[in-house]
A protein has these predicted regions:
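A short alpha-helical cap/connector motif
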Residues: 1-103, 107-132, 136-183
Length: 183
């Protein structure tokens, strides 16, 4: 039930270099032989899409990237568009309706991560997984982050920290959050 070692050694995907494969193996294993729908944002050369296709033999897999790709991958549908453009995301959702796994390995810009999460999360199936890679970009200025202002409201890291507060609002002494679309 492991992601085949030959698949990720022969594919120079950064997921192997970053140690993501071992983590994904743990969390994705329950989906392995199911008929799932997987969306990956940010596909570069398609290496990770090939990994998902081989690991999830019964899955419908799609990938999106802002740059049009000059390759195709058997069993994978490719979309070209901006991950922060809700109209573009709507075309993907209209075709697939919902997803079991969504992986955001796109631009790593906080505003893009927040926009795509806000649009796509409501289309994640119950018990589905939404993964955002490389959240450390919240601390890197060129991605809209800050190494100094750790509470900068516009970073993806702080968006998710606040979301954790929002989902648990009823446990505060004096609740100051109201229910939200992520409940």
């Amino acid at each position: 039930n492991k992601i085949p070692i030959n698949v990720y050694i022969s594919n120079p995907s950064n997921k192997n270099k970053s140690g993501f494969i071992e983590i994904y193996q743990k969390w994705f294993n329950e989906f392995k032989n199911k008929e799932i729908k997987l969306l990956e944002i940010g596909i570069d050369k398609g290496d990770s899409l090939r990994i998902w296709r081989d690991f999830f033999p019964n899955a419908k897999i799609c990938g999106l990237d802002i740059v049009k790709k000059d390759f195709s991958i058997n069993g994978v549908e490719l979309f070209t568009g901006d991950q922060s453009d809700c109209n573009f995301l709507k075309t993907v959702v209209e075709k697939y309706k919902s997803f079991d796994i969504i992986i955001d390995d796109g631009s790593h810009l906080s505003k893009h991560i927040i926009a795509s999460f806000s649009y796509l999360y409501p289309h994640l199936n119950n018990n589905g997984l939404y993964v955002v890679e490389d959240l450390q970009t919240s601390y890197i200025p060129r991605y809209g982050g800050s190494r100094i202002r750790l509470n900068k409201n516009s970073t993806s890291m702080n968006f998710f920290k606040k979301l954790a507060d929002c989902v648990n609002y009823e446990h505060y002494d004096k609740p100051f959050f109201k229910e939200n679309k992520f409940d």
